[in-house]
Amino acid sequence: MSGEDNYTDYDTIIAEIESRENATKQYQHVIRMIYLITYSVVLILGVTLNFIVIIISCLKNKKSPTVSSWITALALTHLVSSAFIVYQLLYAYNNFDWNYGNASCKLSSYITYGSMFSTAAMLSLWSISSAILKIDCLNLCKNCNIILISLSWAIAAILACPSLYSREVRYSQCIDDYDTDELKTTQEGIARLKAVVIMRFLIGLLAPALVMFLSCLTSAHRNCKVCKEQAQIICAIKIAFFVFWGPQIFLTMLQATVTNSLDPILLKYGLPVATALATAHSLISPVIYFLFGFSFKMKWMEHDSDKCETVLDRGRPLLHQ
């Protein structure tokens, strides 16, 4: 009887192990398919649509240099980010086996977070310039927008640097590792990780949200129909930034700071979905331009709202273009 019981226990253990392995394989397959579909769509549509936006905005630069400059800069940022998705696509396709070197592992993460920070900085500085800087001030500095855009890229280049330090290939996987000791997790490594994710939340999300909200309160009210349409589109791309990046940054911060009190299912399924959502941000802006503008020609860019504000300030009729 004892021998039969041992065989029964052994069979039960084997069945449990096989069940866990099947569940793990099924989970990995689902996550892999989510990434493959998302990355493929972002790579194809992100590169194509952002390239189209760059061409259109450059053609409309003479009619509306202010808006076209910011739209071009955003599209260029998202174009680069979309192009580098090819590494993540190949990574998911090869069952998360990284065979492309340590440098590309670091650069891929650096470009991703650089895109986030540059977008946040551009939308923030654009909001400030629209709320504070008037047309007369802009005339004194014709390259004011170019300077602000360059400043946005410089800020992003600095804030994304932790990826160059932490990202590395370990056991054929491209992961974040903030520990100097390769064999174990240290308190110093955990502290560095917490500092980075909190910094991304505060500077990448919270500060831009506050700046955009305050700028919205202080910006001039426009009665012009075209101005309103343009403002709605710009507002939509600002909201989209927080909707697409917010979950990933917030969940990553929670994972690093309060892991023990979180539901494991939330991180197991929520974080991969949030990561895919953040990746999709690179293509959402062109979609907003075309859908909200009801035209692939992006005619809403032809209107210069700064000139409209200047006419209003002088008490003249609204200027329609």
Give the predicted meaning of each segment.
Residues M1-A23, L138, N145, F294-Q321:
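Intrinsically disordered regulatory tails of 7TM GPCRs
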Residues M1-I52, Y178-E182, Q187-G189, V196-V197, ...:
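Extracellular N-terminal segment of 7TM GPCRs
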Residues E21-A23, N95-G114, C141-L148, I158-L206, ...:
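Loop architecture of class A 7-transmembrane GPCRs
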Residues Q28-S40, T66-W126:
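Extracellular TM2-ECL1-early TM3 structural module of rhodopsin-like
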Residues V42-L43, A73-I85, Y113, L148-A160, ...:
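Alpha-helical transmembrane segments of multi-pass membrane proteins
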Residues G114-S150:
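Class A GPCR helix-loop hinge within the 7TM core
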Residues D177-L205, A209-V211, L217-T252:
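Intracellular effector-coupling site of seven-transmembrane GPCRs
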Residues V243-M253, G270-Q321:
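Seventh transmembrane helix
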